[in-house]
Each structure stands twice: as C-alpha cells, then as structure tokens.
Amino acid sequence: MSGGARKAAFVLPTIITVAVIALIGTAVLQYRQDRSDRIAEAEKIGAAFFSDVATFEAEVQRELSEVRSGEPADLKKVVDAKLEDPPVLASAPDGAEASKTYRAAVKAEPMVLDPYTSLSDKLGRAVEAKAFVKAADDVLDHGPIVLLGYGTVFDSGPLRKRVLPELNRSLAEFRAVDVPKGAHDVAVKVDGALTYVIGQVDTMADHADDGKSYEFSYNTQYNAARQAVRDYATEVDGDVAEALDRIRGAKPT
C-alpha cells in the first residue's frame, strides 16, 4: 500500500470517529435541554396549582364572611358550592418528579380539601343539631307547672284533660325528631325526664280521684336533661368554630 493510501486509511476512521462523537454530544445536549424544559413545565404546573389553592381558600373565606345570617345551613351551602369546583393539579410531562414544586403539589393535593370537607360535615351536624336542640328545649320548657300553674290540685280533671294530653303530645313530637349522631344519650335524658313527669302526673290524678294528697318534684330530671342539651349544643358549636379556625389558618403544604 502506498504512503498516500495508508494516510487516507488512518484519516478516514478518525473523521468517522469525530463525527460519531459530535452526534452523541448533540444528542446529549438535546436530551438535557428537553429534560430542563420538562422540569420547567412541571414547575409552572405545580406553581399554578398552589396559586389556585390560594385563590380557592380566599374565595371560601370571603364568601363565608358575607353570610349575614351565620346559620349553619347557609354556611354549608357556600362550602359545598365551592367544593364542587376545587383546585385540581394538572398532569405534567415525564420527569416532573424532578421538580420540587410539582412534587410538593402532588403531596399536598390529596389533603388540600380536608379542612373544607371537614367543615361541611361539621356544619351538616350543626344543622341537624339545631332542630334537635330546639325540640328538646321546647319539651323541657313546657313542664306541668307551665301547663297547670302553681298551687294545690284537688280535681283530676285539669290533669287528665289538659296536662297529660299536652305532655304526651310533646313527648310524641320529640320522639319524631331525628336524633343526630352523638346525641343519643341526650335524647334518652330528655325522653326520660318527660316520661317521668307523665308518670307522676298520672299518679297525682289517681290520688286526686281518691281524695288523697300527692306531690312530686321533677327538678332533678329536668335540670339534668337541660344540662345534657346545653353540653351537646356547646360541643357542636365548638366543633364548627374549630373547623372554621382551621380553614382560616389553612396553608398548602
């Protein structure tokens, strides 16, 4: 092989090698650029999610503050309406896990609505509790003394014709009221207090028919029932207040 041919033989592989290295280098650079673009896109998606969350939180708090009545039912309507259109984390390109902001958004998304769903639940309980507490208060506010007045009873007529029918009607109405979760023991106390009074009034009527004296007190039963109702109402109100405080301090993680 001549000198020129040998030189060409060595130069050609070198040129090919250089070309291959150049192509590989270009591919690596392109991959890095594509990866950088995907991460940047994921950052934008994550940031947009947190921005939507902040807007959602601000809107809920603003709309709740505009509810003049302060009634649990009205507050619940606001929360439930907002929960129908919650912030949603958009899908991201491959490699999004390399984005710190997107990873944080993925972690936060499952818990973002927790304070609001909890508030909705607490408000729903408060709505039920309000009707129950009112029914219990009405029953306990219309005892025998309210219906009959103070004094000595000599005739069973008013007891049988007015007091007992009214007490039995009140008991039936109370028993027809839905008992919210967590209020069963309260309902038992109220029911028991009224049942006790009905039994005592019936016994008093029998004694009046026989010309015998009879007296009874129902303060212990009624006071215990009233306290149970107050404690239950306080607990429900406290749960709502706590849930409201939680959303006021809610921050995406």
Language model: regions and residue ranges:
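Feature targets compositionally biased, intrinsically disordered low-complexity regions
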Residues: 2-3, 24, 69, 94, ...
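C-terminal amphipathic alpha-helix
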Residues: 46-67, 98-253
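Generic alpha-helix initiation/capping and coil-helix boundary signal
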Residues: 15-20, 35, 39, 180, ...
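Transmembrane signal-anchor/signal-peptide helices with a preference for the extracytoplasmic
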Residues: 5-8, 20-47
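Intracellular, membrane-proximal regulatory regions of polytopic membrane proteins
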Residues: 72-114
